[in-house]
A protein has these predicted regions:
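Signature for HUH/AEP ssDNA processing cores
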Residues: 2-130, 140, 194, 198, ...
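Catalytic core of tubulin tyrosine ligase-like
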Residues: 135
Length: 209
């Protein structure tokens, strides 16, 4: 059963000039930017006192999760503004329509991103504090026949979520390794990303399982 906090979670007004308020504004701007480029978003749970909480119900959550149903993911600017006015704590990108996500251990993902194939034709890539790399690729994507040999290679199911910078996970920042601006907000070629992963799979990075 979910635990509940005793006090209502407070939201810092967006007009405030405190560091916390500036961080919330940066999260709102990240959500608006993603939605403007056709990437569906959802607000996520808040990290507080070493736990995640749903800012609507005050219940603790099992990790960083959406606080509204996944099927409500949207690119509507008005809805995004409304959500991040009261639920500004995390930005979650939702897979299946605008992009798919291929996830691998971070060091392997970085090795692949540095490979000549992706240096010339990069894919947006997120790295998380849990040391995972998430490549955003065009839909529909299917896994290369060799990649399922490594258990931590994951092709996200539709309506999966991936945290977008500057969201925090366990109190630490999620970051772009390859920003979407570098690719004109175009997801990468899934075949090319996977060829780069296969090409770098023999190194130590791929054995980080």
């Amino acid at each position: 059963m979910s635990e509940r906090v005793s006090a209502r979670l407070r939201v810092t007004p967006c007009g405030s000039s405190t560091p916390a308020a500036r961080r919330l504004i940066s999260l709102r701007d990240a959500a608006l930017s993603a939605s403007q480029h056709g990437w569906p978003v959802l607000p996520g749970s808040v990290w507080r006192q070493s736990r995640y909480y749903n800012a609507i119900t005050n219940a603790s959550t099992n990790g960083l999760t959406p606080v509204v149903p996944r099927q409500h993911a949207t690119v509507d600017r008005q809805q995004v503004r409304a959500w991040w006015q009261t639920l500004p704590h995390a930005v979650l990108l939702v897979t299946g329509k605008a992009f798919d996500v291929i996830s691998v251990p971070m060091s392997w993902g970085i090795s692949a991103a540095k490979h000549s194939m992706l240096r010339h034709d990069p894919a947006p890539m997120i790295v998380t504090p849990e040391r995972m790399a998430h490549f955003l690729v065009t839909v529909p994507a299917t896994l290369h026949v060799e990649l399922p040999r490594w258990p931590r290679v994951v092709l996200a199911e539709p309506l999966s979520v991936v945290p977008a910078p500057p969201t925090r996970m366990d109190g630490n920042l999620v970051k772009w390794w390859i920003t979407p601006n570098r690719t004109d907000w175009t997801p990468g070629d899934p075949a090319l990303v996977q060829r780069a992963l296969v090409a770098t799979a023999s190194g130590n990075a791929a054995r980080e399982t």
